[in-house]
Amino acid sequence: MTPYSSFLFFILLGILLLPTIILGLNGKRFQAYNMFISIIILALIFSHDLHGVIALCLFTIWQVLLISGYLAYRQKANSGFVFCGAVIASILPLFLSKIWPFLSHPQPHHPPHNLISFLGISYLTFKGVQLIMEARDGLLKEQLPLHRLLYFILFFPTISSGPIDRYRRFVKDEQKAWTKEEYADLLYTGIHKIFIGFLYKFIIGYAINTYFIMNLPAITHNKILGNLLYMYGYSMYLFFDFAGYTMFAVGVSYIMGIKSPENFNKPFISKNIKDFWNRWHMSLSFWFRDYVFMRFVFWMTKKKWIKNRMAVSNIGYFLLFMLMGVWHGLAPQYIIYGLYHAVLMTCYNFFEKWNKKYKWLPSNRWTTILAIVITFHFVCFGFYIFSGKPFHHHH
């Protein structure tokens, strides 16, 4: 059962969350109950997928051993090699799940069963890597209580597609004793978000896909216009589908007393590509910014291998977006999508510097509108690449 994809899922979820809501509105602690229903809901999600359950359990044991082991090691020593080893070991299951389809030679009609992969592996990997990095930075000092670590890794509302939370932020919410009034606020916000999610995913997103994208052959026979309309349609569909999905995840988290981070902030009114990545899939881009880009820039500055700061940040962007592309998958569209955004970020970097120097583009209402329109088209073209449509040859 895929999370948030059927009304049955919401009905079961509603029934299971009732005790949480009653406890919360009476100002009582509900985290132990939440941990209990998390197990039930994970069992529901994976009910038809025994491979998935086994993979999830093995993956979780692997990550917990790695994190606990590295934390224990970090209290005594701090070698860069051990740190890199731990990070690589943490990413290994995800890496294997990505290359698995290429390793096993499938018959064209029977895709091989990916034994390593399971729903949510890409998002859970972020949690493991993040904990190891925070231990390295000395932000996590003592061993993490097992139940709390497991609850963080396996927190079901965000398991399949994020948003990506941070351990210390999560635990602060998890340990907090919400008052009746605070919980009533959380509950209201959560339900509100869930209804916006219904609007986005099941009404707007569904309508765009069913009545626009599916009907494109009937709307126009012109190939160029057809592709252009597909680009706009797909970009809108992607946003409403994914933002709706995120609304569900965040809404359910709020009802469970966890304020999961937001993922979208009006991405289509971004004034430039940097602004776009601060508004689109924010928990993902901030994760890459903090754990890949900043580390890389810091490391380069410390080692003084490349003196030019502009070059360092541009190489950092290529590293970040190539990783982000590969993280989505190894199909050509994802890798080209990553490259495309790296090039855009680099060009914008140069433009920004140049514009600061020569004041070529004045800042007023019209240039802002122009900037939004230009950014929007660059972004949509990126999604057009991402959709894989340019790579499908029609017979």
UniProtKB/Swiss-Prot annotation:
Q: Which residues lie on this side of the membrane: Cytoplasmic?
A: 27-30, 77-79, 138-145, 176-179, 257-266, 304-308, 352-364
Tell me what topology the record assigns in the membrane: Multi-pass membrane protein
Keyword set includes NAD: no
Taxonomically, the superkingdom here is Bacteria
Active site, per annotation: H328
Keyword field: Acyltransferase, Cell membrane, Membrane, Transferase, Transmembrane, Transmembrane helix
Q: What pathway is this protein said to act in by its record?
A: Cell wall biogenesis; lipoteichoic acid biosynthesis
Instruction: Please state what class of enzyme this protein is.
Output: transferase
Report the EC number(s), separated by commas if there are several.
2.3.1.-
Q: Does the keyword Transferase apply?
A: yes
* One annotated GO biological process: lipoteichoic acid biosynthetic process
Q: Where in the cell is it found?
A: Cell membrane
Functional summary from the UniProt entry: O-acyltransferase that catalyzes D-alanylation of both teichoic acid and lipoteichoic acid (LTA). D-alanylation of LTA plays an important role in modulating the properties of the cell wall in Gram-positive bacteria, influencing the net charge of the cell wall. Catalyzes D-alanylation from DltC carrier protein.
The similarity comment for this entry is: Belongs to the membrane-bound acyltransferase family.
Listed name of the protein:
Teichoic acid D-alanyltransferase
- What organism is listed for this UniProt entry? Bacillus subtilis (strain 168)
State the organism's lineage. Answer: Bacteria, Bacillati, Bacillota, Bacilli, Bacillales
